[in-house]
Amino acid sequence: FTDHVDYGPYRDWDDPRGIQYRPGDEGEPEQVALTNVDYKKYFSMIEKMREKYREKIAIKAGLEFGVQTHTIPEYEKLFRSYPFDFIILSIHQAGDQEFWTNEYQSGRTQQEYNEGYYKELLSVVQNYHNYSVLGHMDLIVRYDSYGVYPFEKLKPLLTEILKTVIADGKGIEVNTSNHRYGLSDMTPSRDILKLYKELGGTIITIGSDSHKKEHLGAYIDWAKEELRKLGYTQ
């Protein structure tokens, strides 16, 4: 399990400043709380499930850290506070501006927001090290209304990011939610996966990024086959 934590725009449920809310979208409550995980309840529930299913499956406890450079100290503190088995490192915002709402992209050119995204990601992996894999590395593609920005223009930044990840002994995630979002390429792209392999990267995990039970495990076998086609054999 890797529930989300996004310090910056989101607060912990017990933050003394109180809980923030946003208006609910269709199918949601009228007001939606902008909070991170209730960590004590989260880990308690995982322990209960481990006990219940111990003869059937191994249940691991993790989180997805949505890190920004300025929020790194909060994640350092959180990492020291609980017994994690696995951490996905992602960025979902830059400067506390969301990608999924196009808040970050607004007022910027396609070049500016793509380069800005990867510069922030590079800064994060250079300065934060308590994680297992880098999640949905080219997330910005999902929310790029102009289409896919040319790989070759981003290759120098992508190379530095991947070199840093590899030198740190970390891996990257193949995220199969590209199917849900109607993307034609893998996440990250095949070009990024080829570059990772060329640079000596070997650690890859596959995740379905499940936010609903019907998403669980979707396209995992497909991702394995695509990785084999790219030369990943272990």
How would you label these PLM feature ranges?
Residues 45-55, 76-88, 125-129, 160-169, ...:
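Acidic (Asp/Glu)-rich catalytic clusters
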Residues 57-110:
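Hydrophobic alpha-helical segments and helix pairs
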Residues 1, 59-63, 87-89, 133-135, ...:
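Hydrophobic faces of well-ordered beta-strands that scaffold small-molecule active sites
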Residues 1-65, 143, 150-152, 212-213, ...:
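An N-terminally biased module of ancient metal coordination in phosphate/nucleic-acid-related enzymes
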Residues 98-113, 139-150, 179:
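Surface-exposed cleft-lining segments at the edges of enzyme active sites
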Residues 30-41, 105-116, 149-156, 184-188, ...:
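Alpha-helix N-cap and loop-to-helix initiation/capping positions
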Residues 11-15, 125-126, 141, 148-234:
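Charged catalytic cores and adjacent phosphate/nucleic-acid-binding surfaces used
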Residues 4-6, 62-68, 92-94, 138-142, ...:
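Active-site beta-loop-alpha junctions enriched in small/polar residues
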